[in-house]
Amino acid sequence: MKQKLTLLTLSLLVAGWQVQAAPQAASAPRQASAPAASAPAAANPAATQPVTAVGLPEIKASAYAVYDAQSGQILASHKLNEHIEPASLTKLMTAYLVFKALEEGKLKPDQTFTVSEQGWKVEGSRMFLDPKTPARVDDLLKGLIVQSGNDASITLAEAVAGSEAQFVQLMNAEAKRLGMKDTHFENSTGLPGAQHYTSVQDLITLSAAIIHDYPQYYPLYSIQSYSYNNITQPNRNLLLYRDPDVDGMKTGHTDSAGYNLVASSKRNGRRVISVVVGTESMQARAAESSKLLNWALQSYDTPKLYEAETAISQVKVYKGADNAVNVGFIDATYITVPHGQAAQLQPVLETVQPVLAPISKGQVLGTVKFMDAQNRVVAQKDVVALNDVAEAGFFGRLWDSIVLWFKSLFSGS
């Protein structure tokens, strides 16, 4: 049986552009029947888009999305999970794995590597590595991110894994770990391949992971130009020159893919990420990305509803040393809503009953669905136990077993 509890009172504090919200006392649980075996659904940003505050401008791209990095919500999308050709957006994963190797001490920024014959002869964009001159890892990273150098990509792949083929195996394993369900890589560069694809959703996932997991390396994405081997090349992300709030991330282009761009903007402490693919030109991908970023920042608020590990309610526990467990969220909870509508949010707690001891802190016990004024789900978040509950003794467990048996007779389960 699923227990449903409406948390009626939210304390709203307005600070500048951002609405801050904090929960107050919860009302008594409201019961709702549901199969006992059903598990709480995990939050799915694509399935819980906020209701549009104002009309989304026309986006001229074959696929796109815009995402709020605090709440984890997709605010608008088109062909979110369809396979697309990433082109040099592939290098987001190449860079992610290099950042990981640096973090783990497997590479050092001042280590040097010489471009292989494969890397030197590779087609497409390059940083113009000299086969006679070893290059430092930190220079190779700038050549990869700023200049989109395929020679830099292959050299870094070989530095991390010994060969590009072995590096590609790491890329696919990391994609799986990150939950990129519609991605498969064939190379580190983004050159076309029959089984080289990703999706807009997966690019959002990867981009958010870079920003969250490796903030110390993220400033590389805002570099406007880089000189190597006496050759200066500009960053092809035109938004870096046009919008002071934009600080990344990566461009991509092939004849078959069109012009792609992952862009990120941070304004007044709030970050949004956009993806556009299949546009007609460098100018077009910048213009369409700018539309998405500005629409998201101007049309939506992302209030903080709960601090990390704040108890929002108690849930009845059977067969436990304690009769109830405090539930809440592991991390601070943000929800993105149309501008000015934060006060209308109504959180509804749902737990699968019965909740049986033993319970470990951090164990998922249900979800909170955030409903708008029309009773539509805006977002949902897993709710977890905030404390351990040990198992009761023999007689305590026996008594609760009897209680649950009688409850099942009357509930029909």
Regions found by a protein language model. Give the residues of each.
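Bacterial N-terminal signal peptides that target proteins for export
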Residues: 1-7
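Structural motif marking the loop-to-transmembrane transition
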Residues: 2, 86, 137, 391, ...
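Bacterial N-terminal signal peptides
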Residues: 8-16
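Domain-terminus/edge residues, biased toward the C-terminal soluble/receptor-binding domains
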Residues: 180-184, 192-197, 201-413
